[in-house]
Every structure is written in structure tokens, then in C-alpha cells.
Amino acid sequence: MDPVPSSASHGNLDEQIAQLMQCKPLSEQEVRGLCEKAKEILMEESNVQPVKSPVTICGDIHGQFHDLAELFRIGGKCPDTNYLFMGDYVDRGYYSVETVTLLVALKVRYPQRITILRGNHESRQITQVYGFYDECLRKYGNANVWKTFTDLFDYFPLTALVESEIFCLHGGLSPSIETLDNIRNFDRVQEVPHEGAMCDLLWSDPDDRCGWGISPRGAGYTFGQDISEQFNHTNNLKLIARAHQLVMEGFNWAHDQKVVTIFSAPNYCYRCGNMASILEVDDSRERTFIQFEPAPRRGEPDVTRRTPDYFL
């Protein structure tokens, strides 16, 4: 085991977290130092990262910093609450930089109390289209912070397993994956590929139709109840929890309550009018959804994005 960081470095990190909680970005140099520490922690985590309950499971955030602050207000501060985030921290919202920096800082400060999975937006290619790249340029005057973060994204775990029974990931299942060991055995440290198992985990969606289907997203697959039932049976799972899709109530059951979608960005893109939710799993593995609405905004710019939408 590495030695625990000294209290001096904790103090510095606590100051950075306090600054980020006020939605003030760190310097480029501070981001670089933070991401170096985060990489050392994330390198040790598994493609299927084990997580103990109690835990609060969260879906997409998409740079909606004030709503993330609201999430922590409702769900409890980290480290008081153990958190599991299922990806898509950046793009679309106005504060991707502050959002992802805060989550990474919390990971470095409390590595056992927060798990950050990779979403399909934690990728070099997607962030160049949907806002994170442009935001880094605007806030730092160059692309260095974007590069630092997208290099770090390669190390984020792809999935998590809560108490051996709730399988958590951003997107969904893959026709090339039958078991959790299949996932444990591949090399995740790379840009999200255009196809194949790793791509599918971050891009696929559950569907009402049986079997595998072609995804309208152009990546991943749709998978039916027969597929999720087989996967859950093979791997001794009770539930698949995933994010990746806007759901108006903040959560949505599928496949006879064996798959749930959790979405944690209320009024998505500042215009969708949806609720957000988080899923609390307690010591006895009882599950409770907590829904929330957007945090009150003061003087926030009205962001109109010129980027294409995919709400599918």
C-alpha cells in the first residue's frame, strides 16, 4: 500500500475542493497535479470495480455543476455518503470543467468513498463535438486541460459491481460479453473504440424488443429482456443499473425491473423539463430513489448550443 498522503497535501486538496464547490476552476498546473494523483488511484481499479453498500448511485451530470451541488445537498456530502457515478460528467452543460475537476478531486481525497465510471462522453472524439473541448479553450486559453482530462479518462473503470448483485455501467450490454470475467480481462486504457465490447458497455441501450438490435445512436446495440435476463442469470446479478438516456422522471424501470436507467441532470440542457434522480442502496440492500429538480439559478447565462442533439 502507498502511504496515505500527508495532512499538508490534504489541506491543499481540501482548499481546492472548497474552491471548486464555489464553481471556481483550478489553475492548469493544479489540474495537472490532480490528474497525476488520480491516475495512480484509477490504475489500481478493476474494469469491474467492486463497491460496498451503502452507496448512492448517480447517472449523467453533463456539466450541470449547480445540479451536482444540489445532488450532494440532497444525497449527502462526500465522504459522508459513498457515491458511485456512472459517467458523462462533461459536455452540453455550461460547467464541464468545474464538474469533472470536482469529481476527480473528491476521488483523490476520498478514494474509498467515490467511484467514477467512464461514460461515452469521457472520450477525446465526443468532447470535441459536444462542448468540453471548447469550454477548456474558453476557460484556459489552450487545450492542455482538455488533453490532461481526456488522457485521464482512459483510466476510469468501465463498470462497477455493488455487493456482487447490482451491476453498474454507463450504457449497457454487449453481444461479445457473456460474463463479468470477460470484462475484467480486457485492456481499458485507450480511447473509446468505435465498436466492440468496450464501446458497447458505454453506448448500448435496453429495448422493448427481444434480442440484439442495431442502435439508432450509431454505436453499441439495443438489447431485449431476454438478453438482460440471461446476463443477470449467468452472472448471479439482481439488477443492472445504467445511465445514458434522458428519462423524464429521473429513473425508469425496464425488463421487469431487472434493468434501471438513472439520469441525474435535471432540466437537461437547461430545457428538457425532466426530473433527476439518484438511487440509494442501504446496508440491507434496500433501494430508494430520490428525485430532485434543478438547483435555483442566479445569473446563469442562457446557453444555446450549436451542437447536434441525440436524445435517443
From Swiss-Prot:
GO BP terms, alphabetized: mitotic cell cycle
Organism this protein belongs to: Nicotiana tabacum (Common tobacco)
GO MF annotations, alphabetized: metal ion binding; protein serine/threonine phosphatase activity
Disulfide bonds: none
Superkingdom of the organism of origin: Eukaryota
Primary location recorded for the protein, binned into one broad class: cytoplasm
Record localization: Cytoplasm
Cofactor note: Binds 2 manganese ions per subunit.
Binding site for Mn(2+) 1: 60, 62, 88
Reaction catalysis annotation: O-phospho-L-seryl-[protein] + H2O = L-seryl-[protein] + phosphate; O-phospho-L-threonyl-[protein] + H2O = L-threonyl-[protein] + phosphate
Protein name: Serine/threonine-protein phosphatase PP2A catalytic subunit
Keyword Metal-binding: yes
